[in-house]
Protein backbone atom coordinates (compact mmCIF):
# COMPACT_ATOMS: atom_id res chain seq x y z
CA UNK A 1 0.00 0.00 0.00
CA UNK A 2 2.71 2.47 0.98
CA UNK A 3 4.60 1.82 -2.25
CA UNK A 4 1.54 2.55 -4.35
CA UNK A 5 0.89 5.77 -2.43
CA UNK A 6 4.46 6.97 -2.93
CA UNK A 7 4.34 6.03 -6.62
CA UNK A 8 1.08 7.91 -7.13
CA UNK A 9 2.39 10.95 -5.26
CA UNK A 10 5.61 10.84 -7.29
CA UNK A 11 3.68 10.74 -10.56
CA UNK A 12 1.51 13.67 -9.46
CA UNK A 13 4.60 15.72 -8.56
CA UNK A 14 6.34 14.86 -11.84
CA UNK A 15 3.24 15.71 -13.89
CA UNK A 16 2.86 19.00 -12.01
CA UNK A 17 6.51 19.94 -12.59
CA UNK A 18 6.23 19.02 -16.28
CA UNK A 19 3.06 21.10 -16.61
CA UNK A 20 4.67 24.10 -14.94
CA UNK A 21 7.80 23.74 -17.09
CA UNK A 22 5.73 23.53 -20.29
CA UNK A 23 3.58 26.50 -19.28
CA UNK A 24 6.65 28.56 -18.39
CA UNK A 25 8.36 27.63 -21.66
CA UNK A 26 5.27 28.52 -23.70
CA UNK A 27 4.95 31.87 -21.92
CA UNK A 28 8.63 32.68 -22.57
CA UNK A 29 8.34 31.76 -26.24
CA UNK A 30 5.10 33.74 -26.61
CA UNK A 31 6.47 36.83 -24.86
CA UNK A 32 9.79 36.57 -26.72
CA UNK A 33 7.97 36.30 -30.07
CA UNK A 34 5.65 39.21 -29.24
CA UNK A 35 8.58 41.44 -28.37
UniProtKB/Swiss-Prot annotation:
Gene Ontology biological process terms in this record: photosynthesis
Top-rank taxon: Bacteria
> SUPFAM superfamilies, from UniProt?
PetM subunit of the cytochrome b6f complex (SSF103441)
Q: Cite the entry's keywords alphabetically.
A: Electron transport, Membrane, Photosynthesis, Thylakoid, Transmembrane, Transmembrane helix, Transport
Give GO MF terms, alphabetically.
electron transfer activity
Please tell me one Gene Ontology term that the record gives under cellular component. plasma membrane-derived thylakoid membrane
Q: How does it sit in the membrane?
A: Single-pass membrane protein
Q: Does the keyword Phosphoprotein apply?
A: no
Q: Quote the subcellular location field of this record.
A: Cellular thylakoid membrane
Q: Quote the InterPro entries the UniProt record gives.
A: PetM_cyt_b6/f_cplx_su7
User: HAMAP family, alphabetically?
Assistant: Cytb6_f_PetM
Query: Which family does the record assign?
Result: Belongs to the PetM family.
Role summary: Component of the cytochrome b6-f complex, which mediates electron transfer between photosystem II (PSII) and photosystem I (PSI), cyclic electron flow around PSI, and state transitions.
**UniProt subunit comment:** The 4 large subunits of the cytochrome b6-f complex are cytochrome b6, subunit IV (17 kDa polypeptide, PetD), cytochrome f and the Rieske protein, while the 4 small subunits are PetG, PetL, PetM and PetN. The complex functions as a dimer.
The name under which this protein is listed is: Cytochrome b6-f complex subunit 7
